[in-house]
Amino acid sequence: ENKKKFLVIGPLLALSYKEIFNKVKENKMWLGYAKQLSGFRLDDGTELLSKNPEGSVPRACKWYTNLDVSYRNDKITLTESVKDKKYEKYYNYKAINITKTLKIPYDYKGEMGVPISFISKYKPKQFKIIGKGTVVKKTKTWKGDKASLWTEKNGKPHKIPFERILIQNRKVNES
């Protein structure tokens, strides 16, 4: 808000917080270079390693920043075509379900639901973030569930088990 530069370590799941997600969506904050931190040293010299002597693993952490990181200007090479593959459509929202970033089609103009892990690969010049799947207005509900995205399996609605981010390709056919 006050235009100061920052670099903060936070839990991966912070992306699911409304305030954090909105900052990412508005390009006011993004992930830094490190893909995932599972060990680091604290000021007092204490080391948090991937596994401590008791065998437990610290939670996955990310760098959250508004500092310029060059990878954000790169492009994800998209090799899939919507014409060559059948993508699941949502039962209650006009978009297709994408299971992995590598499966994003280069020739699809509509909205797509991608896993929340997409944020670590997000390129703002290539993609537009529409919103989180749990908060966009649905076309219909199933069993009173107004938040979840559903696909259709065997003729019946099937709940998507994990949060989805809805995106749109700004550069259709430019893979």
Predicted regions mapped to residue ranges:
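Class I S-adenosyl-L-methionine-dependent methyltransferase catalytic core
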Residues: 1-175
